[in-house]
Design a protein with these regions (language model features):
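Short acidic-glycine-tyrosine-enriched beta hairpin
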Residues: 66-82
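A short, N-terminal "cap"/entry segment at the start of jelly-roll beta-barrel domains
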Residues: 1-29, 42, 109-131
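Conserved hydrophobic "DFG−1" position in protein kinase catalytic cores
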Residues: 32-34, 54, 89
Length: 131
């Protein structure tokens, strides 16, 4: 059994959201993800992993190519393998509990509009623009 106190594990950074892996269990990991107001994740996917977010406090919006949904305390969002998504935090600090599991945790980033320093890696370009 693994037990976590998400409030005590929370770490915030004014420059970028923080993803702190709390443990690796079986074929996945569990993470506390901490967001300052207005922070945005990269627009990304995990081709071989399912990613589940549970909102502990705060909230914002989760976006996919198909839709945008509110993320509120007590709510959860499940991204199947390969689904492009990004999280946009709302006006308050947020703490999300993330569970990822699958055969490979690799992340491919399509874009990161909120991070002007971000540059695509060769593997990101190859994944999104094959051939």
């Amino acid at each position: 059994m693994e037990v976590f106190d998400l409030g005590a594990e929370a770490v915030f950074d004014p420059a970028r959201h923080v993803e702190k892996i709390l443990g690796r269990i079986g074929g996945g990991d569990v993470t506390v993800a901490c967001w300052e107001p207005g922070q945005t994740s990269p627009y990304h996917c995990h081709p071989d992993a399912t990613e589940i977010y549970f909102c502990f406090q705060g909230g914002g919006e989760m976006r996919t190519p198909e839709r945008t949904v509110p993320v509120r305390p007590g709510g959860a969002v499940v991204h199947p393998p390969g689904e492009l998504h990004e999280y946009v935090n709302g006006p308050a600090r947020s703490v999300l509990f993330r569970v990822r599991y699958g055969t490979d945790m690799r992340t491919f980033v399509r874009s990161w509009a909120a991070n002007p320093e971000w540059q695509a890696r060769a593997e990101d370009r190859a994944y999104f623009n094959p051939g």
